[in-house]
Amino acid sequence: MPSISDDDDRASVRTERREAAVAAFLQQTPVIYQRDVTVHPRAAEWATQTETAPVCLFLTGAIGIGKTHTAWQATRQWLAAHITRTGRKPRIETWRSTALFDALRPDSHDWDVRTLTRHLQEADLLYIDDLAAARVSPTGWTQERLYEIFDERYINRRPCLITCDVLPGATANIVGDRVQSRLREMFRGGVLLLEGADRRAGDAA
């Protein structure tokens, strides 16, 4: 029978693992988003990934409202909660939309598209920043890869976090009709409109 000291040791190891993982992730975070901020209660709820929390979170609002800063903070909280719950360090993929769409192009020289697609499908958390900043390729190739990524994550209930200036239902001109339809399903109950003053007037957004 496990003793109390065994439980304490396991808890201590898990705490050390969590703190080390969060510190490492913080070092990978862009400098202006490393400062802690208070996140909206619904974003904090998503980060806990409890049974009542939405699997996916879509942060929207005006330019400069703080979507990206909120997203990085919520991702750190999600990371800590995941390790507390499972004891395992998750794999988190963070991408700016413009870089992601370029990487998914069939003529990409930096990535094997099929390998990258599978990598993004299987990550424990996929965070895409500023979705409205990018546009799909006219050939439809990027649309197909995006659909494969989002569909696989949707059917396996793998968390996604997206920041965007427009609502999921208004993303057709960005990602195409098919992907837009999947996004609307994925983020049902997980759309959060952030409101307030433009933080870029005197701070990071």
Which residues does each PLM region occupy?
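Conserved catalytic network of the ASCE P-loop NTPase/AAA+ motor domain
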Residues: 51, 84-87, 118-121, 151-156, ...
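Loop/turn-to-beta-strand initiation segments
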Residues: 90-91, 122-125, 154-162
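Active-site signature of alpha/beta-hydrolase-fold catalytic machinery across serine-
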Residues: 73, 77
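Walker A/P-loop nucleotide-binding motif
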Residues: 54-72
